């Protein structure tokens, strides 16, 4: 809703010029679609591993661009093609463990005890996504700051200076790690550096979490089924759903 209101409300800088924006912020958008449909699809395509676009995300309003990046950084709401449940599953394990500690009950999920080993793996998996993204951004920023001749040799990367240039690099690696594919196209990314580094980011961001998630499944599969008792933490309640949402919001968002 914030994304839609931003785009339909128009650009305040253009308002200051006295230019009417009856159709909203139309920069980078197709007239046949308009600002509302473009804003809606920018959210739909980034909340899943879709990546198709019907407008230029780099031209959207600041809050819209933030929401697009946040969707991919959380990488859990609706899940990606083929691995949709797996990231959500990781946060369920964390939520079960934290909930159990909070209420003094044994952390269990699907009749299997969730213990320290599962929690350690789930924590590593949850931290991998931001680590892979920020590692790529750190490398590109280091090269841009200390090896400008290398950047110039690739035709230059940033067509927008300062903080938005950083956002373009952050979006690029976020999109790759989330297996999305959309981009802030003010970034000159069709170079050897960007193609290789985002390729590796995609591979690591896709397969390393799967290794951890399958390891958790293997550990749980090897444990005996524990019948439900009065001390079992129920995972089919609204309360646990809210708890899982809180864990996703706090851990994935940060």
Q: Which functions belong to the PLM regions below?
A:
Residues 58-85, 97, 101, 107, ...:
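Non-catalytic terminal/interface segments that mediate subunit docking, oligomerization
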Residues 126, 138-139:
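Short alpha-helix boundary/capping motifs
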């Amino acid at each position: 809703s914030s994304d839609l209101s931003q785009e339909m409300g128009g650009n305040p800088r253009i308002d200051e010029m006295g230019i009417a924006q009856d159709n909203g912020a139309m920069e980078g958008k197709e007239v046949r679609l308009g600002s509302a449909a473009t804003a809606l699809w920018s959210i739909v395509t980034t909340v899943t591993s879709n990546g198709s676009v019907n407008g230029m995300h780099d031209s959207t309003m600041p809050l819209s661009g933030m929401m697009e990046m946040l969707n991919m950084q959380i990488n859990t709401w609706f899940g990606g093609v083929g691995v949709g449940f797996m990231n959500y599953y990781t946060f369920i394990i964390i939520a079960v463990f934290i909930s159990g500690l909070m209420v003094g009950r044994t952390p269990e999920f699907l009749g299997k005890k969730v213990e320290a080993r599962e929690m350690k793996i789930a924590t590593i998996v949850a931290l991998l996504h931001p680590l892979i993204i920020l590692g790529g951004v750190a490398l590109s920023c280091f090269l841009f700051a200390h090896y400008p001749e290398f950047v110039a040799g690739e035709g230059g990367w940033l067509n927008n200076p300062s903080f938005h240039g950083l956002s373009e690099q952050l979006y690029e690696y976020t999109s790759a790690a989330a297996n999305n594919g959309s981009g802030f196209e003010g970034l000159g990314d069709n170079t050897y550096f960007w193609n290789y580094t985002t390729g590796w980011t995609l591979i690591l961001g896709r397969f390393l979490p799967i290794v951890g998630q399958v390891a958790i499944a293997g550990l749980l599969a090897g444990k005996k089924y524990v019948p439900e008792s009065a001390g079992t933490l129920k995972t089919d309640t609204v309360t646990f759903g809210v708890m899982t949402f809180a864990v996703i919001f706090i851990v994935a968002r940060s």
